[in-house]
Amino acid sequence: MTAPNETTIRFLLDGETVEVDGLPATTTVLEWLREHAGRTGTKEGCAEGDCGACTVVLGEPHDDGGVRYRAVNSCIRFLPTIDGKELVTVESLQAPDGALHPVQQAMVDCHGSQCGFCTPGFVMSLLALYLDEPAPTRERVLEALAGNLCRCTGYRPIVEAARCAGVYPEPARWSRAGAADAARRRALDALARDADLRLPDFHAPRSLSALADAVAARPDALLLAGATDIGLWVTKDLCELPPLIYLGEVPELQRITADAGGLHIGAAVPLSSAWPAIVAQRPALAEVAQRFASPPVCNSGTLVGNIANGSPIGDSMPALIACGATITLRRGEHQRALALEDFYLGYRRKDLAPGELVEAVHVPAPVEGERTACYKLAKRFDQDISAVCLGMRIVLDGEHIADARLAFGGMAAIPARARHAEAALRGQPLRDAVVETAAAALAEDFTPIGDMRAGEGYRLRAAGNLLRRFLHEQTGGTVRLAEVTV
């Protein structure tokens, strides 16, 4: 096999090496499949990573020596980012004799398809689950399908199909044993490149120093990780993007390190790896981790990408700010640390110099007496944008609150701390009167706006109710909520 050309995208598809030249860097995987490869089984529904009709599976080398297969949204995934990986589509599953894969046959037998438009996406999400877990629980199935929408079946037969797919005979293609075959890893290793992938308006450095040099040399470039937000600028806003510098090939940014001081999460670590590490440290954050986004989005998007995006309704920032997270910024060889809440200067404005990048986020370890939670209010449980999000951390010394940190999303132009409410809690006992004083102080911290997700009055009163919920949960008491209207 010839060495990879630094201007040619190479990946595996059905055991064959595919080489792609001459396409724009913002060509999506879905666009390539349907318009260039003739693989029309993968559908476009929403073009923003919400509906799951476009789901495919990507395989990439794993530290255990094998290949890890994960579902991703092809509608917002740029083609150069699958260089060196294995692409699996719904057409890949059928056996040479025409027999269906177990996840497909289970969908047929359980009557899991009606109009059929969403079915290929469900099948691919189920394939990723099938390869990962032979006997998934119902809860695990629901998590795996959180990014797939169907408007026909009501989901019950699809969930049944997922539960029973594992009892079918092993398929000729894409069995668990076949996916774990060492030959697949060898085929991916053969695609590994020493030189950076360089396309017009796309550069994928392969070391942290090379990345820092590239960003410093092109401060006008746009840094790209998972494209779960940037992808929409192309598919929905039809934007012409500036040159892209891709973080996903930098080994130093793909690591999570843990020590007595906490977690250090690199800028290219996907959300599907970052959140479990955080939840292992703070189990109370499990719900917001589950609700953050669907598996396909979390398998592409990164925690640092969510931080760097700086949206006032980004769900990671309230929890991280409450935990006292800091970020590491780099320009060339120079690094500096910054408290996460100080990173945001105003709407879409950040303390980020030209040519500087966010290298990592550090989440401090819990301390004795710490209680933490994060609550998200949205119109849907899965795959929805917050109206209000509260991240809260208190440290108890006996019955008194020695320290308190409250951070909100959806209440201001930036993710922000509620410093007046914090002051009302510090040094006080866990009592109803203290809770009410802190809830009232939120009006001094925020003047929220009204929009399509919630009115200003709703946001302020709902924020107070989330504060009441947290503090009453710590005492085991009854939550007395203020009445709110949207």
State the predicted function of each range.
Residues 5-11:
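Short structural boundary motif marking the start of a folded domain
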Residues 92-95:
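Extended heptad-repeat alpha-helical coiled-coils characteristic
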Residues 12, 17, 57-61, 70-74, ...:
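C-terminal structural segment of proteins
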Residues 16-25:
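Short, contiguous acidic and Ser/Thr-rich linear segments
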Residues 33-39, 99-100, 132-135:
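Short Cys/His-rich Zn2+-coordinating modules
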Residues 24-56:
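A basic, amphipathic helix-loop patch mediating RNA/tRNA/ribosome contacts
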